[in-house]
């Protein structure tokens, strides 16, 4: 009889990972942590944690509320997907990053004052593309 533990192949086999693949997984986990913090920040805004009196979630304009709920959900979903190094995690995170940059650039009156997020998100996207390409180059055909 076969041992069931030897039949199951790990999702990410350590013996066949290259240097850039390990770096990619590390990068994805770091970005997952950042996405988790961003998602929790938005949930704190929804829950009113740290908000001055009179500036609760329902006192803010509807566009701010909708955007905050969107990022509260998508950032946490992206964090899970990135942590698992799943392909859908990268797609969800790229959607969140591009959406955040778009909101900051095109609608500064909604969140306003955080233009530093645009180059930060852009730098992370460029780094993601670079590390992903390097990891793909080291895989055998």
Model-derived regions: residue spans:
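Topology signature of small-to-medium multi-pass alpha-helical membrane proteins
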Residues: 2-141
